């Protein structure tokens, strides 16, 4: 509905504005990822909305990453490939979120020209109990590395999970092991004091 589109635009603008504030308080540039829905991508003015959010916030576009789901690949392929290439032309990076849970297609993965794969937390959480989950995580990491994609594992809660992922060659991780979600004022205070 129209409300979802308006909300998505507000989230994107707010995220860019907050990223500007965060980087004013950070000793090194920090990147932010924003989930974008299939409905947003379908909007004919999406690129204009993104470009406006970047200019209004005055952020370096290389610090913004848009997270897309595998379902984006199910849209008109030529339209999506063109749109994603134009987004990358602005300097914004792209990540496939929750990789391995949707319509994983190697041909789409190559054609969509993404920068990063985010390994779904359901596999990460189960990899110490399930050989199948562990093999899936390892396979995604090997695939990503062979395609020269950055990899990030979602939902890391235990040091043992982080160690396994590091040994497998995963580049980055996110989850409660590292930090819980923080409200912007608390994050800014944390950045200022460190």
Where are these regions (language model features)?
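Short, conserved SAM-binding segment of the class I
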Residues: 14, 83-86, 139, 143
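Catalytic core of bacterial c-di-GMP phosphodiesterases, primarily the EAL and HD-GYP domains
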Residues: 3-79, 155
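Catalytic-core regions built around general acid/base machinery
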Residues: 50-53, 82-90
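EAL-family c-di-GMP phosphodiesterase catalytic domain
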Residues: 37-44, 63-78, 90-194
